[in-house]
Amino acid sequence: EQAIKMITGEDVELNASGRTDAGVHAFGQVANFKTNSQIPIDKFAIAINSRLKKSIVIKKAEEVDERFHSRLNCKRKTYRYVINNSPEGTAIYRNLETHIPQKLDVEAMKKAVKYFEGEHDFKAFKASGTSSKSSVRTIYEAKVYQSGDRIFIELTGNGFLYNMVRIIAGTLVEVGLGKIEAEKIP
């Protein structure tokens, strides 16, 4: 909002399609705001990027219908957790992945993650202080896959509660460590 005000001179209300928990990175985040600015739309992203921290980059700007709202019109969101499952970890990606040196049972995690698919009440997978009226959410796709020493947990759904994905990922790690049986998830 401050960067937009710097280039337009207007106070705007920025609506993002979602919030990110601490330590979570957003790729493909969509946001909208109303402006009377005369800056050409094809120059807007460049102008805003010149005022943002280096950790935030606007990829594209486009005009949308006045009724559009990034969060309310969002159809689905995907979260991906990356686990480095090597004994030593890596320094270069330490802010983008979680290092778990104990060998994880990926097959058990793959079995367990499927129990999260569908419409469920996820009240057991939300942090305290969650203000959502309902804890019912739909997960369209849930998967665990491995590439080398990295294990990926991906959840795509219609919305997520505060810390819900982090708690699900932690539960799947517990399954991978043999502390919880996959069949105990439902």
Which functions belong to the PLM regions below?
Residues 2-186:
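Structured-RNA-binding interfaces characteristic of tRNA pseudouridine synthases
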